[in-house]
A protein has these predicted regions:
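N-terminal glycine-rich phosphate-binding loop for ADP-containing cofactors
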Residues: 1-200
Length: 200
């Protein structure tokens, strides 16, 4: 299979046969962190901006809308079984799911979509569903918001290596860069995470 992928001019990522494989196991702790920020009352556009400034092609809430809230719930449940990582806060996603807000495909999720484009700042109806606080209870700056978003992805990457789900740090790079489109500062998520963790 790897040889066939190479013939297509692509690169394969070999991972152990576990729910979510490598890419989703990096992605979902990050999405979970974003939902934590939402529930703490952080402005949605700040969350999205911090993510894209760090190198993601789109913010985590928009990404959940693209995945589909229903799909995200199923994937998170599969990963959570027997995993040390935690899926996105299911009660928050369930609130959207039960309201029929499944993301872009239904025209509304975290954001409302008009003519295919998300409306900025979130939809008041969605905010009412998932944001009990009215103010930012974290009282932190963008640097801290970014740390809270991406440190769980770094920790998940270490978990993948320690458990042998992937073999090398190069596999991790391929998973987040090729699989998620993430281009972090300095180009190395693991190095960033080590520097942030050592500074705590």
């Amino acid at each position: 299979a790897a040889a066939y992928v190479a013939q297509l001019g692509k690169r394969s990522l070999i991972a152990a046969d576990v729910p979510g494989f490598a890419v989703n196991r990096l992605l979902f702790p990050y999405l979970d962190a974003a939902v934590d920020l939402v529930r703490a009352g952080v402005a949605w556009q700040r969350i999205e901006t911090c993510a894209t400034a760090f190198g993601m092609p789109l913010g985590p809430l928009a990404q959940l809308d693209e995945i589909g809230i229903d799909v995200a719930l199923r994937v998170a449940a599969a990963i959570h079984r027997g995993s040390v990582t935690v899926p996105p806060k299911s009660e928050t996603l369930l609130s959207l799911y039960q309201a029929g807000r499944l993301g872009r495909k239904t025209g509304a999720g975290f954001f409302r979509y008009e003519n295919g484009d998300p409306q900025p700042h979130g939809d008041p109806q969605a905010v009412a569903l998932v944001c009990p606080p009215e103010t930012d209870t974290l009282n932190c700056d963008d640097h801290e918001r970014t740390r809270r978003l991406f440190l769980p992805m770094f920790e998940a990457a270490n978990d993948l290596l320690e458990r042998g789900i992937v073999a090398t740090s190069d596999d991790i790079h391929h998973a987040y860069h090729g699989g998620l489109g993430l281009n972090p500062p300095g180009g190395d998520l693991l190095q960033w995470g080590k520097s942030v963790a050592s500074a705590r």
